[in-house]
């Protein structure tokens, strides 16, 4: 029976299966079923109906559907269902003369494969654990064998139909019977459960089995017969439609004929049937004489038919690669049913593995598949995740192909040509030139050759399957390989020409330092696509891709395609030549279109620019360098030339040395320098970054900084101080002294006045200082130009030397170890370092344990006492000092802001050097403190200070730091009001700062104003007033020498006696002012506020200023209208233990009366309250309020004050104070004729809560100790002093009248 077609006719959606006698089945059929020696019911295997359709969709359900991944790899797939069921409704039409004489099983519920394919196309495969079981449609369930029934069918007898191919009526599948014996009358077929997309195998007819049992082929016998045949070139081949994968073709397995075992059951043998070589294509030889006589087709006829089919397929329109893999719906083309076996067998075993492999009974019994399983992924959208997605792949080596034999057919295929996809295990092509832009050729025909080239593919191999030697080779000619060119890097791209684009996977062109030929050395790079590029270079001429395959090609295009990179300091040369190839300027100008300039590397080889040259080169060295420069220029006339002047950009390097410093070129004529800068600007017109290559780093800056400035940039704008250089012990004056303005010699008089400076001689300290027993004062200043400089970015303090005061830029030039810098006046302080100060060195905290002077060079940074070296010990986390001592230069240390606030400062007043003066800046609360301290900053010269003769420039700028000259804001600052004229004002509704003379001869002190402080200050100054930065105490002298001492200094070294009297400082400009007040927003307990209350002067709200300006004068009633209270009085509180007090009004009656009389401020201090004029004040201890305490006692009319310098007294240890009083009180009493005296013992200590206990203990001890004296003792502290100022009363109730004591003290004076 030949050309027999079998079709399921139970429904339009029934599957049509094809079978052949020598059946070639798909890999999926072999993989899904994998059944060997499956027993069949012997009752149904009779002589006349031996061939049963085995594997119909419902006979044996696909076991993969009901197995997880582990079961697929570990268990056998046989014996799934042994109970066949019959169906009586199935009729089969046979398209040949022969009819089977037995019934076949009828599949009652054939699944709709189209619906299944559509389902898996839009849905992903379920998980590994429950593979394909989540689909609940009943249409997928196969009909069990028990429900299948045998049916007979008739076949046409027309002999013309024997060699015809009929178009199938079903759209879902087909089957084709190969040539069979014409003598067969009946045939019984069993359809497997594989999808219709794979050709199923037809079993032999009953006649073939009736001939003899020895005709049955066993595995062993098959191998023997196959070896005897010697080749299968002349064997007739069955024509079978093969289902292949578009990406990873696999080898093909087929069924052998069935055999009947001894127990009466029919078994089925499975073996490999193809050796897929062009010279050796054959089928299974069954050695059956009946079969030999019944074969009708030869292999030559089959090849001829296949060629016709392939030619028909070539006429199809070629779509894109994604569309090529879709199923073709054409039903009119009969040739679509057949595909050449050569194109189907993609995974072909090599000749070494030509021997057929068969399943053995041991593999069945052990239920372990001997082939590997691969879940393959494909871009095909037609049948994702179908039940064929799990297949047995015989040939794992699918990543190699012959070079000369590949031509992939990308025409639309039939619907049965599907791509199996599954994402569980991916076989993915990573890099392949065949996957892009390959034109369609003939159907896949693969030939095995010796030359192979691997295609980069990632594949998962089964551990139990040995790799075969079948390979794929790269085709000889590819229509086109579309490589995406890599764009050039923006920094190096040419603005005028894009000469070459490289393949996407190629390596970058090696950057040769001295070459401009981009084609040079291209051949030396290893390109993985070099073979592909050479094969496809002719086809890719339409693209702008220039690929140099050899050095000869580069030499030919060297001149025409060369790109010149114009650099300022590099000559144009080839990297491989020793001689420099120079182009003329005309040639360079004519090739502007091929000359490019790198935006980032325009000035890559510019010489080094040193802005600090004036500080780092001595005049002698400059002269030597100038001579050297002239000699070098004679030998290198073209070392730096520009193309704009018909010169060539060239800067050679000899012996690896760096380029010459631009600082040397500065000393040429100004004409040459300006011409150089002009040419540089013309050469680089774009605003690109300039690269200055220094010895250590490469600095980048904007192009507009190419001019070499005479002055250094302001140091406050830098992110960090200049890096410290190594200290050079043999540094001479010439190395630092660059010009007269940079001289470090101390000058007197006004800077920049043109007068000759007078150098002074200094006495340098000797030895190593290890202790400081007293605080520093202005008497210790030897080097007045030694300063601390606060850096504005990190607020650290660095040592330096004050060079000069720049009046134009309102700052000072400070020399550091790394150079000089312009610094603001308020950031400069005296370099007053002492033993015990905590400093920072190399990021760690150290304590100064010694000071030493090792050099007498005036240009070395040293402190005000002359020490230039410090001895340091590291401070541990526990606070203890380490044992190791470091000796470092003073210029290498710095101070943190926290340590700066804790240390004692130099005392610049004429008072004695005590702790209170050293820490006086702490008397201001932090909230009201404007800066670290305002009294230590060297200021610029002013006209008012010309007549003051001081020994140093710094101290000259800081004359009488507590006087009004330093503390007030000069009226010259009124000129700056023009800049703020348009600024909105909070003081006036009009929003303008008016000018006038409302506050002429008036002084103001501002405190606790943070929002509109500056605006208020400008407003006062615009109306003629003066703002004092510190309090009113700086306007007075309140300590005076005594005319007669009450104690003998020889016996009391730690006791000092002062005469307190409030008096204006001499030459004061404010004594003749008519009005003074403090401006704030509320009543406070600040020092400025308390000083104003002690003087009896008004404390006013800040709106008093705007009210007076509106009235255009100071109206007297406005003073009381905006007068603020004096503060909280705890003495007026009814409940004294309570924390709160009573707000008391301010009493300014005396001041107000004098103001109405027109008196000036000189007369305003005459009416100071005399509350302590009959008391002898004894102050012991030190604090930051020492100056305020003296001023307050002077305002309260305390005539005499004695200070006892004692260490801090503990509550449990008051003996030192009692012993001092025991010797002092009797002597005072004897000097005052033993009269009744009043003593006020004031504890100038900050002991917090323990102070009250200390006061109570002292009161009791003093009363007991001096009980025999008829004296009055009062022991008080800071809170009492504040309450006395607020309440205008001491709170003492003594029996002795004030007049008696006052007269007694007056007699002593």
From Swiss-Prot:
The modification Phosphothreonine is found at residues 218, 471, 474. It is found in: Nucleus. GO terms for biological process: DNA damage checkpoint signaling; DNA repair; double-strand break repair; mitotic G1 DNA damage checkpoint signaling; mitotic intra-S DNA damage checkpoint signaling; negative regulation of DNA strand resection involved in replication fork processing; nucleotide-excision repair; positive regulation of transcription by RNA polymerase II. The modification Phosphoserine is found at residues 26, 56, 205, 248, 312, 315, 462, 568, 729. GO terms for molecular function: double-stranded DNA binding; enzyme activator activity; histone binding. Present with 400 molecules/cell in log phase SD medium. This is DNA repair protein RAD9. It comes from Saccharomyces cerevisiae (strain ATCC 204508 / S288c).
